[in-house]
Regions:
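Short, well-structured alpha-helical interface segments that form or flank functional binding sites
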Residues: 41, 59, 73-77, 85, ...
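Alpha/beta-hydrolase active-site loop
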Residues: 108-172
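N-terminal cap/lid segment of alpha/beta-hydrolase-fold proteins
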Residues: 1-56
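Short, surface-exposed "cap/lid" segments of acyl-processing enzymes
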Residues: 45-125
């Protein structure tokens, strides 16, 4: 799915024989990474919570988090409760460029605070500027299409996850398991 990200040389439509050039905006804050090359966004892990009864789960709930989330802490009790009450496995799936799919420095107060201060000076009417959203705001400001492209990447990653599930690649979940989607954002 990484081929959908800005910076990829593989943006091509076979049906229309049309190649797309990547047009990403530029930032002045060392956040101008080529999306296609953010390794932690391409190769990532996800958590699975399930009952400990040593059987393959015949159902799975894929949980999506909200925009700009950085940690699974508040979702773990929910995943546990969902798994316990339904008997299904729960997969905590990180959307593109979030959680463990974003460089750690994007969550660093020390590194993002100066960027937030600069944004506050540039956009004085924005009263919600903080180091917490400095990276995502700066990157989306430079290239708003990132929201669409990362959504498309997440969609394709989920298609791959379900393909792997159906092929039996998730040993504690039955290949015939039902799949439910659960999204939450504050």
């Amino acid at each position: 799915a990484k081929y959908y990200l800005p910076g990829s040389e593989h943006l091509f439509c076979k049906e229309h024989n049309l190649a797309f050039t990547s047009q990403s905006g530029h930032t002045q804050d060392d956040l101008d990474w080529v999306d296609y090359e953010v390794e932690c966004n391409i190769h990532f892990t996800y958590h699975i919570v399930q009952p400990l009864d040593n059987r393959k789960s015949d159902g799975v709930i894929i949980v999506f988090h909200g925009l700009n989330e950085k940690k699974w802490d508040k979702y773990l009790p929910w995943a546990y409760a969902l798994s316990k009450r339904t008997g299904k496995a729960v997969i905590l799936f990180p959307i593109a460029f979030h959680m463990n799919r974003a460089p750690e420095r994007w969550s660093s107060r020390q590194e993002m605070y100066p960027i937030a201060q600069k944004r506050m000076a540039e956009y004085p009417d924005n009263s919600d500027t903080s180091y917490v959203n400095a990276a995502i705001s700066t990157r989306l400001d430079a290239f708003p299409q990132r929201l669409f492209w990362s959504g498309l990447q997440t969609y394709n990653d989920i298609v791959q996850l379900i393909t792997d599930l159906r092929a039996g690649a998730l040993p504690n979940i039955a290949p015939t398991a039902t799949v439910d989607l659960f999204g939450y954002s504050i």
